[in-house]
C-alpha cells in the first residue's frame, strides 16, 4: 500500500537510495525475532528443538505462542551432542555460531529441509540455503535501527505494515562521541523491541541501500585476522576464515 505524502512543513531526512539491499531475494522484516515469529506462525510446530547455548530471543516467541521447546546439548567446540532428528510437525533450530558452523548447517539443511531453521545472525553475508528457513540481522553488523532478512519464506503477505517504532538516538550519540550516553539509550531501545511481525523501516531500508558491502566484508575479515593473531593462543576453537 503506497503511503500518502504530505506537502509543506519541514524537510525530511535526505537519504538517497544509491544502490539496493545485499539480500534482494530475502524478505526484510524488523529483526530476527520477527523472522522467527513468522516461521513459527507459518509452520505451527508441535515441538521445536533448540540448543542450550542460545539467546532468549529464540525461545521467548515460542513461549508467547504456547509452543513446546526442548533443549539439546552442545560441546565446547559448539558442536551438537546427540542432535535430535525432527519428526513430522517438528522444527530443529541450528545456530551458526559466529559464522563458524557453515559446513555443518549446510549438511543438516540438506538432510531435513524445511524442518530446519538456521539462525544466521552472526553471518550477514550469507544469502540463505536452498532447503531451509534462515534469517540474518542487519543490526548486528551496521548502525541501523532495525532490519533482518528472512529466507525460505513463500507466499508471504507483502502488505505487512512497515515498522515505525524506531529510534536512532543511540546511533547519533555514538557518532557524536557520546559513547556512555549512547550505550544507555541503546539498552533502552533494545528493551523496547518486540516480536511483532513488521517490515523493515523505510529509514533502515534506505541506509542499507547505500553501503559498500564488498569493502565492508573485506575490512571485517582484516579486523578478524588482527584480533585472531593477538588471541589465537587462548582460543580452543579451530577457526578457518578466508
Language model regions located:
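PLP-dependent aminotransferase class I/II
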Residues: 6-16, 20-27, 54, 93, ...
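Active-site PLP attachment segment
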Residues: 131-172
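Structural motif
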Residues: 49, 91-94, 117, 135, ...
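A short, gly/pro- and small-residue-rich
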Residues: 108-117, 148-155
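A basic- and aromatic-enriched beta-loop-alpha substructure that forms the phosphate/nucleotide-
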Residues: 91, 98-107, 117, 121-126, ...
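Short hydrophobic/aromatic-enriched beta-strand-loop microsegments
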Residues: 68-73, 118, 134-136
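PLP-dependent aminotransferase-like
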Residues: 5, 9-22, 34-112, 124
Amino acid at each position: 500500500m503506497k503511503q500518502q505524502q504530505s506537502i509543506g512543513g519541514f524537510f525530511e531526512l535526505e537519504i538517497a537510495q544509491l544502490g539496493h539491499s545485499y539480500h534482494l531475494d530475502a524478505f526484510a522484516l524488523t529483526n530476527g525475532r520477527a523472522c522467527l515469529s513468522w516461521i513459527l506462525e507459518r509452520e505451527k510446530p508441535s515441538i521445536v528443538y533448540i540448543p542450550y547455548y542460545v539467546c532468549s530471543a529464540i525461545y521467548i516467541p515460542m513461549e508467547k505462542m504456547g509452543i513446546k521447546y526442548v533443549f539439546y546439548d552442545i560441546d565446547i567446540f559448539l558442536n551438537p551432542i546427540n542432535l535430535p532428528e525432527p519428526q513430522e510437525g517438528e522444527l530443529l533450530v541450528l545456530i551458526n555460531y559466529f559464522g563458524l558452523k557453515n559446513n555443518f548447517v549446510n549438511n543438516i539443511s540438506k538432510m531435513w529441509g524445511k524442518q530446519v531453521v538456521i539462525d544466521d545472525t552472526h553471518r550477514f553475508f550469507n544469502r540463505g540455503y536452498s532447503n531451509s528457513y534462515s534469517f540474518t540481522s542487519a543490526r548486528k553488523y551496521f548502525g541501523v535501527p532495525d532490519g533482518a532478512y528472512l529466507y525460505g519464506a513463500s507466499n508471504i503477505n507483502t502488505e505487512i505494515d512497515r515498522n515505525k517504532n524506531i529510534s536512532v538516538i543511540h546511533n547519533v550519540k555514538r557518532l557524536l562521541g557520546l559513547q556512555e550516553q549512547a550505550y544507555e539509550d541503546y539498552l533502552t531501545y533494545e528493551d523496547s523491541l518486540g516480536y511483532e511481525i513488521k517490515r523493515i523501516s523505510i529509514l533502515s531500508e534506505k541506509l542499507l541501500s547505500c553501503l559498500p558491502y564488498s569493502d565492508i566484508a573485506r575490512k571485517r575479515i582484516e579486523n578478524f585476522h588482527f584480533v585472531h593473531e593477538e588471541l589465537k593462543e587462548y582460543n580452543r576453537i579451530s577457526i578457518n576464515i578466508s
